[in-house]
């Protein structure tokens, strides 16, 4: 064994093995519910983010239209 490897203590190994065995037995003995309840879909965060995105698009489109109209009204090619 080199200096970087460590050897676990025997007592720790036994307690970890016993805990794992107990947890495995509990999980095996537990029965799944006959009719599991499905969680209610939560559309609120998604809806809010879509509304925010739509609002941002409207603001951006409004700013672009304002800039376009200003340039069209103030810059006349050849006149």
UniProtKB/Swiss-Prot annotation:
InterPro entries (alphabetical): UBact (IPR037543)
Domain of life: Bacteria
GO molecular function, one term: protein tag activity
Residue spans of biased composition, Basic and acidic residues class: 23-32
Compositional bias ranges of the Polar residues kind: 1-17, 40-50
Ranges for region Disordered: 1-50
Keyword line: Isopeptide bond, Ubl conjugation pathway
Cross-link position per record: Isoglutamyl lysine isopeptide (Glu-Lys) (interchain with K-? in acceptor proteins): 79
Physiological role: May function as a protein modifier covalently attached to lysine residues of substrate proteins. As this bacterium does not seem to encode proteasome subunits and proteasome ATPase adjacently to UBact, this tagging system may serve another role than targeting the modified proteins for degradation by proteasomes.
Family: Belongs to the ubiquitin-like protein UBact family.
Protein name: Prokaryotic ubiquitin-like protein UBact
Species name: Rhodopirellula islandica
Upper classification of the organism: Bacteria, Pseudomonadati, Planctomycetota, Planctomycetia, Pirellulales
